Structure formats: C-alpha cells, structure tokens
C-alpha cells in the first residue's frame, strides 16, 4: 500500500501503475527520483497530471491545484491581523521537498515580514504530513514556548495539532490557521 510522504512507496506505485493504467494523477514530493520516473513515463507517452503539489519543470501534462505561495501569503495576512511584533508562531508543514507546503510556508513568512513580523519569532516544524510527527512537534513547541500565540498548519495534520493543544490544556488560548476543507478540520471550527 502507498503511504503518503514515502518516496519509495510512490516510486513503487508508479512502476506498478505504469503497466496497468492509461494515465496517472500524481501528488508527490519534488525530488530527483520522482522527476526521473516522470521522465521515463513521458518517454513511454504515459500522460501524467500533478495535483495539490507540483513538480515544476517535470514532463507532465499540467498541474491542478492552488497557487500555494499565494495561499501562504493570504494565510500570513490573516495571521498578521491577530499578531503583534514579538508574538511567537509555530509553522507546521510537510517538508521542503513537498512544493505545495513549501510554497505555503514561504508565502506565509514573506507576508508576515511585509506586515512587520520577524521570521525569528516563527518556529518551523517539518512533520512529513505524519500524524505522530505533528503531534510530537506541536506538543514540544507548546511545552517549550508557553507564550506561543499562533499555529499555522500548512499541512493536513490538523487533528494532531488539536490533540496536542487539548493535551497541553491550551485549547482556545492559541489560534490555529489551517488549509483544506476536510471533514476532520471542519470538526474543529466553531
């Protein structure tokens, strides 16, 4: 089975699918191994569409998804309305290889800086879109930074973030900003 965020699983799945399908829709990390696989698929005339996170410059038909950098800038603008210079922020994203989340993170930090907030006040956690890693990172940030004011979830592990807040007794004390309209995320809206 494919476990998202695991490049080896992604490459294996692409090899398997290439023999059985007429086209592939792919959401994967931008790394040399995936680029090489896309090149081989293109040589075989296998149509590939990337979605949610692009692999810029790769041989694919098109990208379908948000402008992640712009989405991050919008998130930064929203966050800046609730923050003052010096307020501590936690930014959680998959990792720098996942272009969609990196774009969100870069746009977020860029917009905060434009609004007068320092990047030094933003702690960054790469959690590979993994529930347990996100839970551990948010729990650690809450324990180490009692003045943490804001968490920007540029990834989809929002339930892990909320579990960490609940466990630390900080629900309602720390603002959380997230993307995506998933059933899990909607349960936390009030």
Locate the predicted segments by residue.
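A conserved helix-loop-strand patch within extracytoplasmic ligand-binding domains
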Residues: 71-89
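Hydrophobic alpha-helical
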Residues: 10-13, 23-42, 108, 123-185
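Flexible loop/hinge segments that line or gate small-molecule binding clefts
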Residues: 33-70, 182-190
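Short, intrinsically disordered, charge-balanced linker/junction segments flanking boundaries
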Residues: 1, 18, 187-190
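Short, structured loop/turn "capping" segments at alpha-beta junctions
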Residues: 84-89, 115-122, 146-149, 172
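Alpha-helix termination/capping residues and helix-transition junctions
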Residues: 18-20, 83, 145
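Hinge/beta->alpha junction and helix N-cap segments in small-molecule ligand-binding domains
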Residues: 2-9, 30, 53, 64-74, ...
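Generic secondary-structure signature for well-ordered alpha-helical cores
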Residues: 43, 81-85, 113-117, 143, ...
């Amino acid at each position: 089975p494919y476990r998202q965020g695991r490049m080896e699983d992604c490459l294996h799945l692409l090899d398997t699918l290439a023999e059985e399908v007429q086209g592939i829709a792919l959401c994967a990390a931008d790394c040399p191994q995936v680029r090489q696989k896309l090149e081989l698929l293109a040589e075989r005339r296998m149509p590939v569409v990337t979605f949610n996170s692009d692999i810029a410059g790769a041989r694919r038909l098109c990208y379908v998804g948000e402008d992640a950098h712009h989405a991050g800038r919008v998130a930064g603008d929203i966050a800046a309305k609730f923050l003052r210079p010096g307020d501590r922020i936690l930014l959680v994203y998959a990792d720098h290889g996942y272009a969609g989340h990196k774009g969100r993170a870069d746009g977020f930090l860029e917009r905060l800086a434009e609004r007068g907030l320092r990047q030094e006040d933003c702690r960054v956690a790469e959690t590979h879109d993994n529930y347990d890693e996100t839970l551990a990172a948010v729990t650690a940030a809450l324990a180490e930074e009692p003045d943490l004011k804001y968490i920007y979830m540029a990834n989809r592990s929002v339930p892990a973030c909320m579990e960490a807040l609940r466990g630390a007794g900080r629900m309602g004390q720390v603002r959380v900003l997230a993307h995506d309209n998933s059933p899990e995320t909607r349960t936390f809206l009030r």
